[in-house]
């Protein structure tokens, strides 16, 4: 292609991006942020809704979706060796039954001892179907992977698993190499040490010019804190990083475990914070374009206040169903590491 044509093409692309960017506000107003808080807040702690059948194992990171009138949860379990991924089911969001493992330890692979999975392409519409979308006739699940034994030990990266069925407790297929890892040549300053939890959504509006968007928390070799960054894809297999900086960071402690929902035309990111003030707690941010996020500066959505979450109250999955907001989170306290629930209405009162 002649040099002049290349320059003209690049200019056209830049102009297209600028025109697209002008369609959306990059900052969400304080009034709107307060309205969102009023919509999503869950002041009533229901308590523990799920313990792993083996109480000696630690559970974490719920992802909840629905199929054929039944609710399902993927969650991860740490047994002293590493993470594996399990599935549970419920008819009412309050009582859960474990179904079995879907990502297990393996041998001689990059992810042999760590497979912490998070279901991809869950419907993000607030009060929506919460169904999981198929792409190329497969269901997809990103996961934290690594081959070192221990709690989030060694070099961790993001893998992608897939399966033809969604709700059966069968082993999912995994790729032989990670899709993102901290040693990648294009790894950014805030992620070149370790990459942790990820979440993948379909961006129907293509705000980034790509249909699939991933958010993940990561730590850098000099940035010794966790921030949330972005990556994009056209096919769920090949991913490229998006932007030069994290979309959410406090430059200390942890910002992590993002979940994205869409309330009308506004995107809401639930995430947890830790150690940039005491404890671990649930927060949120808002965006009109999935790229520019306004962080909430008010009170926590969830914080430690009971025996069951006295140590940590963190790692959100939030849905609205039949007029009630359900905020699932990982509670760490006197009952161990379990899944707890807070709601917008008091479900304990009959």
Task: Cite the ranges covered by each PLM segment.
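Extracellular glycan/ECM-engagement signal in secreted proteins
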Residues: 316
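Bacterial Sec-dependent N-terminal signal peptides
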Residues: 1-15
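Beta-rich carbohydrate-recognition and catalytic domains
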Residues: 13-117, 121-197, 201-256, 261-311, ...
């Amino acid at each position: 292609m002649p040099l002049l044509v290349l320059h003209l093409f690049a200019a056209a692309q830049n102009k297209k991006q600028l025109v697209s960017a002008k369609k959306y506000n990059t900052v969400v107003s304080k009034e709107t942020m307060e309205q969102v808080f009023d919509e999503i807040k869950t002041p009533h702690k229901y308590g523990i809704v799920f313990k792993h059948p083996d109480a000696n194992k630690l559970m974490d990171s719920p992802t909840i979706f629905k199929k054929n009138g039944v609710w399902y949860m993927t969650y991860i379990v740490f047994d002293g060796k590493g993470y594996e991924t399990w599935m549970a089911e419920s008819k009412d969001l309050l009582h859960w039954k474990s179904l079995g493992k879907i990502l297990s330890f393996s041998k001689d692979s990059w992810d042999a001892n760590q497979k912490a999975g998070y279901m991809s392409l869950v419907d993000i519409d607030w009060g929506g179907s919460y169904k999981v979308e198929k792409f190329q006739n497969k269901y997809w699940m990103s996961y934290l992977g690594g081959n070192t034994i221990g709690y989030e030990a060694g070099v961790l990266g993001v893998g992608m698993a897939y399966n033809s069925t969604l709700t059966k407790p069968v082993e999912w297929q995994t790729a032989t190499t990670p899709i993102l890892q901290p040693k990648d040549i294009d790894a950014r300053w805030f992620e070149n040490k370790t990459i942790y939890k990820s979440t993948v959504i379909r961006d129907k509006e293509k705000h980034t010019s790509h249909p699939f968007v991933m958010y993940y928390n990561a730590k850098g070799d000099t940035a010794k804190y966790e921030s949330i960054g972005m990556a994009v894809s056209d096919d769920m297999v090949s991913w490229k990083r998006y932007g030069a900086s994290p979309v959410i960071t406090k430059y200390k402690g942890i910002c992590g475990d993002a979940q994205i929902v869409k309330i009308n035309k506004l995107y809401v990111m639930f995430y947890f914070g830790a150690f940039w003030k005491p404890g671990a707690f649930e927060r949120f941010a808002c965006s009109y374009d999935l790229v520019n996020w306004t962080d909430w500066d008010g009170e926590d959505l969830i914080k430690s206040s009971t025996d069951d979450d006295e140590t940590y109250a963190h790692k959100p999955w939030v849905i609205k169903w039949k007029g009630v907001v359900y905020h699932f989170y990982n509670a760490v306290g006197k009952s161990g590491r379990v899944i707890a629930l807070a709601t917008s209405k008091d479900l304990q009162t009959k």
